Amino acid sequence: MITIKKGLDLPIAGVPTQVINDGKSITKVALLGEEYVGMRPTMHVRVEDVVKKGQVLFADKKNPGVVFTAPVSGKVVEINRGAKRVLQSVVIAVEGEEQVTFNSYAANELVSLDRETIKTQLVDSGAWTALRTRPFSKVPAIDSETKAIFVTAMDTNPLAADAEVIINQQEEAFVAGLDLLSVLTGDKVYVCKKGGSLPRSSQKNVEEHVFDGPHPAGLAGTHMHYLYPVDTNHVAWSIGYQDVIAFGQLFLTGEIYSERIVSLAGPAVNNPRLVRTITGASLVDLTDSEVMPGEVRVISGSVLNGTQAAGPHAYLGRYHQQVSVLREGREKELFGWAVPGKNKFSVTRSFLSHLFSGQLFNMTTTTNGSDRAMVPIGNYERVLPLDMEATMLLRDLCAGDVDSAQRLGALELDEEDLGLCTYVCPGKYEYGPMLREILDTIEKEG
């Protein structure tokens, strides 16, 4: 067991009950183009085209062979683009049940398949896009290989679902997915989990590792840091546990598995719980009658690093396993810093609330102040459990110092790894976008 001591479990109200329920009926789903780092689409469909489940919607011209397929059958009703023609979303109105089918296999046949057969079916079905590289967090090239695949079979994000509850409902598919990954890498598959019992693969190159401690103990970046540190010469791949299940279902049934179980939770949710829905589901549909009255912000993903779900982005993200809802914090408070703060949370124990352990807080979207200077008071070191000089690295991100940031470990990180640093920052800096700019520059300059 690897025990993480640094970090923070955010005491936010609206914790979900760990029981799976059916979600609202979904009328629209979408693929969100901006989720795929560096992707340049070649469109295969137009508005009004009728598509089957599993049909190619667009391909990546910068990553030849990688295709993105429809998670449902229906009609393409929107293709949304932003500044510089960046693809924002391809929206499908759900209709019918037609689908593209693929080869199916018995569970005991999977480990005897060759790597090329597995890779081809994953690529053709669009399931390949569930994999992400580290460094850079991109969909891997179809001719690339890795010596390490990390399965994130736990989730320590605030308000997250318990991975064990979901995996134990799909034991056969999860093991099948692990067997496929064991062939895909030929080297090691690291299944990273919290304490508890999960179905296990019998393949010798599939290893289980237990992580314990506060968030970010459940992030792939943390697991890689301790088990297989990455750089440009040591590339690892990561995949979420629900995508491992989808891999298994694809090969066991020959059909694309689009079901996604998400945590619908937060202080502004009427009945926080786990709900069954579809990959890319409309969050307008999913949250209908689920949120409290008033102005709220719906977030696809975690409150620490998710994306605001509004307009052309109002859909469940490809890599997200939760939907969080917060009240918009627009109220101004006179001399808020001077009150005891019994109902306010502070990492630095600035408020009276730190005397009441176990208290959950109705947090909002407010930043509690305007932008200001970055102040190194030890907050970053308190929540970043990686062997890095946190303050120095974050300072380099602010300054855009590519060389120094790379030396200090920026290549090991993804935006989600800095979510807590953003949360505890007294200067209100958003470190995720700064990190992405640095990573893009490093990749561009080779």
From Swiss-Prot:
Q: What class of enzyme is it?
A: translocase
Q: Please state the Enzyme Commission number of this protein.
A: 7.2.1.1
Tell me any Pfam family this protein matches. Answer: NQRA_N
GO BP terms: namely: sodium ion transport
State the reactions this protein catalyses.
a ubiquinone + n Na(+)(in) + NADH + H(+) = a ubiquinol + n Na(+)(out) + NAD(+)
Under the heading InterPro entries, the entry gives:
NqrA (IPR008703), NQRA_2nd (IPR056148), NqrA_C_domain (IPR022615), NQRA_N (IPR056147)
Question: Which controlled-vocabulary keywords does the entry list?
Answer: Ion transport, NAD, Sodium, Sodium transport, Translocase, Transport, Ubiquinone
A GO MF annotation of the entry reads: oxidoreductase activity, acting on NAD(P)H, quinone or similar compound as acceptor
How does this protein assemble? Composed of six subunits; NqrA, NqrB, NqrC, NqrD, NqrE and NqrF.
**HAMAP family cross-referenced by the UniProt entry:** NqrA
- Which PANTHER family does the protein's record reference? NA(+)-TRANSLOCATING NADH-QUINONE REDUCTASE SUBUNIT A
The UniProt entry's sequence similarity note says: Belongs to the NqrA family.
Q: What does this protein do?
A: NQR complex catalyzes the reduction of ubiquinone-1 to ubiquinol by two successive reactions, coupled with the transport of Na(+) ions from the cytoplasm to the periplasm. NqrA to NqrE are probably involved in the second step, the conversion of ubisemiquinone to ubiquinol.
State the protein's name.
Na(+)-translocating NADH-quinone reductase subunit A
Protein species of origin: Aliivibrio fischeri (strain MJ11)
The gene that this protein is the product of is nqrA
